[in-house]
From Swiss-Prot:
The keyword Nucleus applies. Belongs to the WD repeat MORG1 family. Gene3D superfamilies: YVTN repeat-like/Quinoprotein amine dehydrogenase (2.130.10.10). This is WD repeat domain-containing protein 83. Keywords: Cytoplasm, Lysosome, mRNA processing, mRNA splicing, Nucleus, Repeat, Spliceosome, WD repeat. It comes from the Eukaryota. Disruption phenotype: Morg1 deletion causes embryonic lethality. Embryos show defective turning into the final fetal position and widespread apoptosis in many structures. They also display severe placental abnormalities and delayed neural tube closure. It comes from Mus musculus (Mouse). One of its GO terms (cellular component) is cytoplasm. WD repeats lie at residues 23-62, 65-104, 107-146, 151-188, 190-228, 231-272, 275-313. Ubiquitous. Interacts with EGLN3/PHD3. Interacts with ERK signaling proteins MAP2K1/MEK1, MAP2K2/MEK2, LAMTOR3, ARAF/Raf-1, MAPK1/ERK2 and MAPK3/ERK1. Identified in the spliceosome C complex. Interacts with PARD6B and CRB3. Interacts strongly with GTP-bound RRAGA but not with inactive GDP-bound. Interacts with p62/SQSTM1.
Amino acid sequence: MAFPEPKPRAPELPQKRMKTLDCSQGAVRAVRFNVDGNYCLTCGSDKTLKLWNPLRGTLLRTYSGHGYEVLDAAGSFDNSHLCSGGGDKTVVLWDVATGQVVRKFRGHAGKVNTVQFNEEATVILSGSIDSSVRCWDCRSRKPEPVQTLDEARDGISSVKVSDHEILAGSVDGRVRRYDLRMGQVSSDYVGSPITCTCFSRDGQCTLISSLDSTLRLLDKDTGELLGEYVGHKNQQYKLDCCLSERDTHVVSCSEDGKVFFWDLVEGALALALPVGSNVVQSLAYHPTEPCLLTAMGGSIQYWREETYEAEGGAG
């Protein structure tokens, strides 16, 4: 007799708080996982960038060199370098191991809201309130960007990179997708100022959050609206959104102190996770596991699924 095929495990959502870390760097403007999810970065209003092991709750290194608050950061694919951007209008390339500044890229006319490496970590992309996305060659000694994308009519709030494509969300209410191979740009008009954009992990869709307290899932190639997700509050702050590690759920920060999870296909609210009484400023989802980082005030919170048991106890 043949045994029935085991059903695929239903996705679990991270709702067990494992750790709260006081980052001691003023307000945490952004929290980001590194490429494999073992470490995380926090961006502080005190001009510092910090590298942590979030499960152990240990601070590994502090990076100092910005002249104003740090607003975003990212790690390279090989964990050797970091990039960051901030209120001082600069983009900084860091050596992870030494903590030293490798390069400072200047040229933006306003604060840098968002930074990303390309997949090879040879180029840093930065988006600024000056309405431009700039591409900086990490290996060149030239101070100018190798490319400037200036189609936006208002500040850039979010930049994401996938293979040969750049996704840029703007306060002008448009998401622009640049195909670098074809030299083409396509634009989807949402209307409300955009706070965050991201690609789905399968690369087929884009997720967009905006200041009308709505998230929208679009077909990447056609711009067709595939889903809308509401219930959270996002009316005045630049808040993060993302998809869960298996593209099963849409996840968003909220101004009412919660993180909201919706079923991607059904659009139904799956969980409103209470974090605290203030705005959930930033979040990051683990690349392969049901694990979430949130930032509120001066601390970050580390969340796992209910069934998770840390090695050696939860600490």
